[in-house]
Swiss-Prot record:
Gene giving rise to this polypeptide: smim12
InterPro entries: UPF0767 (IPR031933)
Superkingdom, natural source: Eukaryota
Name by which UniProt lists this protein: Small integral membrane protein 12
Pfam families for the chain: UPF0767
Positions in coiled-coil regions: none
């Protein structure tokens, strides 16, 4: 009798195992969801872009944006380019 049962179990194992595993998985999923409870809603944080915009707005609030350097003043402080090394300095 046992060899017949083992042969039947071996033959029909995929048809028996999948529904059993499905039921066990579904019960475990529902049990875990019940034990954990409903998840708390996370507090919405500002994105990196929004933080950057807020920071730049705070920085520009105290400055007069109409007072900018002219191009000539900016050029005085630029570093010398590699190709300009052999040129003579203006004195």
């Amino acid at each position: 009798m046992w060899p017949v049962l083992w042969a039947a179990a071996r033959t029909y194992a995929p048809y028996i195992t999948f529904p059993v595993a499905f039921v066990v998985g579904a019960v475990g999923y529902q049990l875990e969801w019940f034990i954990r409870g409903t998840p708390e809603q996370p507090v919405e944080e500002l994105s990196i872009l929004e933080k950057r915009e807020e920071r730049t707005l705070q920085e520009t609030m105290g400055k007069d944006v109409t007072q900018v350097l002219s191009l000539k003043e900016k050029l005085e402080f630029t570093p010398k380019a590699v190709l300009n090394r052999n040129r003579q300095e203006k004195s």
